Amino acid sequence: MDPTECLKQLLLAIADGDKDDTVGYLQDLTEWLQKDGALPDVEQVVLELT
């Protein structure tokens, strides 16, 4: 999963209160950051979700 989609899913899981998905997507995003070191455009992702 690409980091932008992972961030979207993480934010949706947080909003839904889904602890298991939140932890899973957070782990995926953390792995991506450790490999690539770059976060997706958080502001753009939030705007797409609202």
Residue ranges of predicted features:
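Short, charged early-sequence alpha-helical segments and their helix-coil boundaries
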Residues: 36-50
